[in-house]
C-alpha cells in the first residue's frame, strides 16, 4: 500500500514543478484517488476476527493476501490508466505551451533586434555629436592655451616696460633735481624783475582807478538813460492815447459840424417858410378885415336894399364863403407845414405818421366844413416852432463849448509834445556825454594796450635773460627727458589697452567654453535619460511578457508572484522624473536579471 502512494507523490512532484498551471485540476484527482486507497485499506483492515483456530487463521490470512493482491492489481491498473491519461494531457499541454513560447520568443527576438538597431542608430548619432563637441572643446582649449601664452608674453613685456619706465623715472628725477636748482636761480632773477615791474605797475594802478571811476560814471549815466527811456516810453504811450482821443474828438466834431450844417439849412428853410407864412397870414388878416367892413356895410344898408341887391348880396355871400373856405384851407396847409417843420426839428420817428395824419386831415378838411379847424392851432404850432429854434440855438452853443474843450485838449497835446521834445533834447545831451565818456574810455584802453606792450617787452627781456643764464646742454637734456617720459607714458597706455583687449578676449573664450561644456552636459543628461527610458520600456515589455507566461501554470504560486510584479510595475510607472538615475539603475539590474533567467 505504501509503494503506490509514494509513487504517486514522486510522480506528482515533477508534474507540479514542470506544469504549475494545471495543479489545481490534478490536485482534485489526486485527492479522490487517495480517498479510494484509504477506503480500500480500511476495508482490508476491518475484517472480522471471529474465526478461531490456526487453520482458519491461515486460510483467512491467505485469503486476505489474495484479496490484497487483487486489490493492489486493481489499484495499479487504475493508477496506470490515470497516469497514462494524465501524461497524455500533460504532453499535449506541454506541446501547446512550447509552441506559444517559441512564438513569443520569436516576437521578442524581433522586437529586441529592432530596439537594438534603433539604439545603435541613436548611439551613432550621439557619438557623432559628442565627437563634434569634443573637437570644439579641443579647439577652444587650443585657443585658450594660445591666449594664455599671449597673456604671459604680454605680462613679460609689461614687466620689461615697467622696469624701463622705472629707470627712466629715476633719470627724470635726477634731471628734475637739476632743473629745480636752475629754477631757484631763475626765481631770484625773476624777483628782481618783479620789483622793477611793481614800480611800473604803480602808474598802471592809478590808470586802473581812473578807469573804475569812469566805469562807475558810465553805469550812473546808463541808469539815468534807462530811466529817461522809460519816461519817454510812458510819455509816448500817453501821447498815442491823447492822439487817439484827439482823432475821436475830431471825428465827433466833424459829425457835429455836419449835423449843425444840416440843422442850419433846416433853420433857414423854416425861417423862410415862417416869413412866407407871416406874409400870407397878414394878407389873410387884411382880407378878413375887408370882409368884416363889407359885412358891417351890408348890415347898415340891408334895410334899403331891394331884391336885386339881395340877390347880389347872396351871390357875394357865396363868393365870400368860398373865399373863406379857401382862406381856411390855406390856414390849414400853413398849420400842417408848421407841424411838419416841428417834427423835422424834433427828429421824432412819429413824423411820418403825423404827416400821414395831416395829409388825411387835409383831404378830409377839403371835404369837411371849416368848423373842424381849431381856433388857436396855428399860434400853438408857431410857439412850438420858436421853442425848437431856441433849443437848436442852445445845441449850437453846446457845440461851440465842445469846440473849446477840443481846443484845450489840443493845447494839452501840444504841451506833451513840447515835453517830449525837451526829453529828447535831454537824451541827446546824455548821448553826447556818453560819447565823450566812450572816447575817454577808448583813450584809456589805448593807454592800457601801451602798458601791455611794455609788459610784453619786459617779459621778453626776462626770457632773454633766462635764456642767457641757462646752459644749452641742460635744456637739451630736459627736452630729451620730457620726450622720453611722454613716449614711455604712451607705450604704457598702449600696453594697458592691449592687456585689456586680451582680458576681454579671454573672458569671451571662457564664456564660450563654459557654454560648450554646459551643452555637452545637457546632451549627456539627455542621452542618459533617453537610455533610461529605453531600458525602462524594454524592462516593462519583458516583465509584461514574463508575467503572462508565469500566470498560465499553477495559480497558487503565480498569485503571490503576480502581485509582487504588479506592485513593482505600478511603482515604476508612478516614479517621477527627478529620480531618473535611481530608476535607470534599477531598470538595468532587472534587465540583467531577466537576461540571465532567459538564458
From Swiss-Prot:
Top-rank taxon, per record: Eukaryota
Stretches assigned to coiled coil: 80-341, 405-536
BP GO annotations: Golgi to secretory granule transport; neuron projection development
Annotated compartments: Cytoplasm, Cytoskeleton, Microtubule organizing center, Centrosome
One Gene Ontology molecular-function label: small GTPase binding
GO cellular component assignments: centrosome; cytoplasm
Assembly notes: Part of a tripartite complex with dynein and dynactin, acts an adapter linking the dynein motor complex and dynactin. Interacts with KIF1C. Interacts with RAB6A and RAB6B; interaction is specific to Rab6.
Cited function: Acts as an adapter protein linking the dynein motor complex to various cargos and converts dynein from a non-processive to a highly processive motor in the presence of dynactin. Facilitates the interaction between dynein and dynactin and activates dynein processivity (the ability to move along a microtubule for a long distance without falling off the track). Predominantly recruits 2 dyneins, which increases both the force and speed of the microtubule motor. Component of secretory vesicle machinery in developing neurons that acts as a regulator of neurite outgrowth.
Family the UniProt entry places it in: Belongs to the BICDR family.
Descriptive protein name: BICD family-like cargo adapter 1
Amino acid at each position: 500500500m505504501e509503494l503506490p502512494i509514494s509513487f504517486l507523490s514522486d510522480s506528482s512532484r515533477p508534474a507540479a514543478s514542470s506544469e504549475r498551471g494545471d495543479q489545481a485540476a490534478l490536485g482534485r484527482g489526486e485527492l479522490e484517488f487517495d480517498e479510494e486507497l484509504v477506503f480500500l485499506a480500511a476495508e482490508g483492515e476491518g475484517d472480522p476476527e471471529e474465526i478461531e483456530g490456526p487453520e482458519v487463521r491461515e486460510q483467512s490470512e491467505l485469503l486476505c493476501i489474495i484479496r490484497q493482491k487483487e486489490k493492489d492489481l486493481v489499484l495499479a491498473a487504475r493508477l496506470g490508466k490515470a497516469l497514462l491519461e494524465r501524461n497524455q494531457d500533460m504532453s499535449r499541454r506541454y506541446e501547446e505551451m512550447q509552441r506559444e513560447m517559441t512564438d513569443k520568443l520569436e516576437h521578442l527576438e524581433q522586437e529586441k533586434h529592432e530596439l537594438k538597431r534603433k539604439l545603435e542608430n541613436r548611439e551613432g548619432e550621439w557619438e557623432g555629436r559628442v565627437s563634434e563637441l569634443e573637437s570644439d572643446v579641443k579647439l577652444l582649449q587650443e585657443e585658450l592655451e594660445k591666449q594664455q601664452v599671449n597673456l604671459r608674453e604680454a605680462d613679460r613685456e609689461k614687466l620689461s616696460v615697467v622696469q624701463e619706465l622705472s629707470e627712466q623715472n629715476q633719470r627724470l628725477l635726477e634731471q628734475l633735481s637739476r632743473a629745480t636748482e636752475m629754477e631757484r636761480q631763475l626765481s631770484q632773477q625773476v624777483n628782481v624783475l618783479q620789483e622793477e615791474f611793481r614800480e611800473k605797475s604803480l602808474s598802471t594802478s592809478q590808470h586802473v582807478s581812473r578807469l573804475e571811476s569812469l566805469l562807475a560814471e558810465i553805469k550812473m549815466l546808463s541808469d539815468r538813460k534807462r530811466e529817461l527811456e522809460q519816461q519817454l516810453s510812458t510819455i509816448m504811450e500817453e501821447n498815442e492815447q491823447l492822439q487817439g482821443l484827439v482823432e475821436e474828438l475830431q471825428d465827433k466834431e466833424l459829425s457835429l459840424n455836419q449835423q449843425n450844417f444840416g440843422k442850419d439849412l433846416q433853420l433857414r428853410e423854416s425861417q423862410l417858410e415862417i416869413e412866407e407864412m407871416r406874409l400870407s397870414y397878414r394878407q389873410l388878416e387884411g382880407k378878413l378885415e375887408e370882409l368884416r367892413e363889407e359885412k358891417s356895410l351890408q348890415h347898415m344898408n340891408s334895410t334899403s336894399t331891394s331884391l336885386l341887391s339881395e340877390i347880389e348880396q347872396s351871390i357875394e355871400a357865396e363868393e365870400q364863403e368860398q373865399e373863406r373856405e379857401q382862406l381856411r384851407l390855406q390856414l390849414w396847409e400853413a398849420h400842417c407845414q408848421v407841424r411838419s417843420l416841428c417834427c423835422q426839428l424834433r427828429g421824432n420817428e412819429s413824423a411820418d405818421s403825423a404827416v400821414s395824419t395831416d395829409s388825411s386831415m387835409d383831404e378830409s378838411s377839403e371835404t369837411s366844413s371849416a368848423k373842424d379847424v381849431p381856433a388857436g392851432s396855428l399860434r400853438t404850432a408857431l410857439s412850438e416852432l420858436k421853442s425848437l429854434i431856441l433849443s437848436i440855438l442852445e445845441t449850437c452853443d453846446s457845440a461851440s463849448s465842445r469846440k473849446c474843450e477840443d481846443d484845450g485838449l489840443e493845447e494839452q497835446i501840444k504841451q506833451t509834445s513840447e515835453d517830449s521834445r525837451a526829453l529828447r533834447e535831454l537824451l541827446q545831451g546824455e548821448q553826447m556825454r556818453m560819447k565823450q565818456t566812450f572816447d575817454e574810455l577808448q583813450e584809456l584802453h589805448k593807454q592800457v594796450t601801451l602798458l601791455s606792450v611794455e609788459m610784453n617787452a619786459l617779459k621778453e627781456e626776462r626770457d632773454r635773460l633766462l635764456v642767457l643764464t641757462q646752459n644749452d646742454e641742460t635744456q637739451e637734456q630736459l627736452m630729451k627727458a620730457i620726450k622720453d617720459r611722454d613716449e614711455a607714458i604712451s607705450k604704457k597706455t598702449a600696453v594697458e589697452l592691449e592687456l585689456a583687449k586680451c582680458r576681454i578676449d579671454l573672458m569671451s573664450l571662457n564664456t564660450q567654453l563654459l557654454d560648450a561644456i554646459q551643452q555637452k552636459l545637457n546632451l549627456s543628461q539627455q542621452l542618459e535619460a533617453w537610455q533610461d527610458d529605453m531600458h525602462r520600456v524594454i524592462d516593462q515589455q519583458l516583465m509584461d511578457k514574463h508575467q503572462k507566461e508565469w500566470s498560465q501554470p499553477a495559480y497558487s504560486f503565480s498569485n503571490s508572484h503576480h502581485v509582487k510584479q504588479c506592485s513593482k510595475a505600478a511603482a515604476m510607472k508612478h516614479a517621477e522624473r527627478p529620480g531618473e538615475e535611481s530608476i535607470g539603475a534599477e531598470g538595468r539590474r532587472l534587465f540583467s536579471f531577466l537576461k540571465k533567467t532567459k538564458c
